[in-house]
């Protein structure tokens, strides 16, 4: 875990210069790499992207039940886990959002900040680095959860901190790694940890200007119990107009970071996998003003 904190420290030290450079973009000829990914998520995982300046993005993440029962429940479509979120791009480097997930009735607020940006020209930098911070609150009724929820409000809180480090290698291929630390205030047994570290990998390969194949995968960096499954998702993107439509197959049903990283329970060998989709719509508030905030 110490390596994750070291990576955070290094990125913050470099990002001070990068953010100052952004304020002076007009003074130098710097070409920043664009569209490493089509949307703000790869499949389950966050991507390097944020909404464009003065753009509000609305995203629906819909995950069906397990496909293992086949036509009996139409491959899980009788059941669903859903997440909605809004995120707003204030400028080229900062976005703020809020969402709600049906799993554990979690409401959350999140920030995405571009600390470093891949660029060429006068300033040549090989990677992009984005910091993702999220705080969530479980709002289950007390009867639905452990009695400890009613003892203290803070027991309902979750904290997610993630670095997204990636590179667009060419017009078709983009890859990223996601060192992640999740802190949960409430654990159910003495053997469970409050703080959980994991490492994610994600990529995109563009087939056409509108269509791409995506995948993400997470592994733990410390011990988990025997029920833990490494989370994965594989799918495709299709962009049309202001919409990005993503379809995926995953071993995790919950679309929120904590649920798909730490609570994936699917097993390909038994057919316990979950079909899902993301759809996002962008709303621009730029009007006739070409100046960014």
Question: Residue spans of the language-model regions?
Answer:
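Substrate-binding/catalytic groove segments of enzymes
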Residues: 208-214, 225, 242-246
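Low-complexity, polar/charged sequence tracts that form flexible coils or short amphipathic helices
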Residues: 156, 195, 206, 226-227
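A mid-sequence, solvent-exposed acidic-amphipathic segment
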Residues: 172-173, 177-218
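Bacterial Sec-dependent N-terminal signal peptides
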Residues: 1-19
């Amino acid at each position: 875990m110490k390596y994750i904190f070291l990576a955070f420290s290094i990125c913050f030290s470099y990002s001070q210069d990068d953010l100052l450079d952004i304020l002076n973009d007009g003074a130098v000829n710097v070409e920043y790499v664009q569209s490493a990914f089509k949307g703000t998520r790869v499949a389950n995982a966050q991507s390097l992207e944020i909404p464009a300046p003065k753009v509000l993005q609305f995203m629906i993440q819909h995950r069906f039940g397990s496909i293992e029962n086949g036509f009996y429940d139409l491959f899980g479509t009788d059941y669903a886990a859903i997440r909605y979120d809004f995120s707003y791009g204030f400028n080229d480097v900062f976005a703020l959002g809020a969402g709600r997930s049906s799993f554990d009735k979690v409401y959350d607020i999140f920030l995405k900040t571009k600390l470093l940006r891949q660029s060429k020209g006068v300033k040549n930098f090989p990677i992009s680095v984005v910091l993702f911070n999220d705080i969530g609150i479980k709002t289950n009724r007390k009867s639905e959860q452990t009695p400890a929820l009613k003892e203290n409000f803070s027991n309902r809180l979750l904290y997610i901190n993630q670095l997204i480090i990636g590179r667009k290698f060419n017009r078709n291929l983009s890859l990223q790694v996601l060192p992640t630390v999740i802190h949960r205030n409430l654990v159910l047994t003495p053997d469970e940890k409050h703080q959980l570290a994991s490492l994610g990998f994600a990529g995109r390969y563009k087939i056409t200007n509108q269509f791409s194949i995506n995948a993400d995968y997470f592994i733990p960096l410390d011990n988990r119990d025997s029920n833990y499954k490494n989370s994965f998702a594989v799918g495709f993107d299709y962009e049309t107009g202001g919409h990005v439509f993503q379809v995926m197959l995953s071993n995790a049903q919950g679309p929120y970071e904590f649920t798909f990283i730490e609570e994936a329970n699917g097993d390909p060998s038994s057919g316990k996998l979950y079909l899902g989709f993301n759809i996002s719509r962008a709303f621009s508030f730029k009007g006739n003003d070409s100046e960014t905030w």
